[in-house]
Amino acid sequence: AGDAVAIGTNAKVLTGTSGVTSAARGIAIGFNANAQVASSIAMGNGATTTGTTGVANAIAIGTDAYTYGANGVAIGMNAGKGSTATSGNNVTVGADSGQRNQGTNNVAIGPGSGNDLGENVRQNIALGSGAGNQIKSSSGFADYNINGGKGYGHNISIGNGSGRDSDGNVNVA
């Protein structure tokens, strides 16, 4: 991988894996760190940046931190783990935060926050331990388009455990 750096036992910067963009300019630091997309940084034991063809610019820092999709940031132990948001643009900071997400353009700060966001969940902010989990946002704004679809989300959850199981748009908890 052009201009790639891998430091640590089993640290890898992948090139041309089926369905994954070459990780040119990728950096992998740590035991089993794995940079799979271009211009990405995977740092920590088992940290991984991955996605589909054309994905780039991801950062995963921490034991088993994980990003899937372009421009994603996951910082903290197990942050972002199990996420499948191909559009990316999610930011998660805190242990066990931002896990199993399918949504895009979301921010989660705090341990265990911003988990299990639905496929159409976009532009949510969760601040605090366990805030903003299981948001569904099932309806959209007719006049607001993101990537060709209706805009869903716009929920703000501040405080420990706030905003759980929200369903709809423009909620503040």
Positions of PLM-derived features:
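Glycine- and small/polar-enriched repetitive beta-structure motifs of secreted/surface proteins
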Residues: 1-173
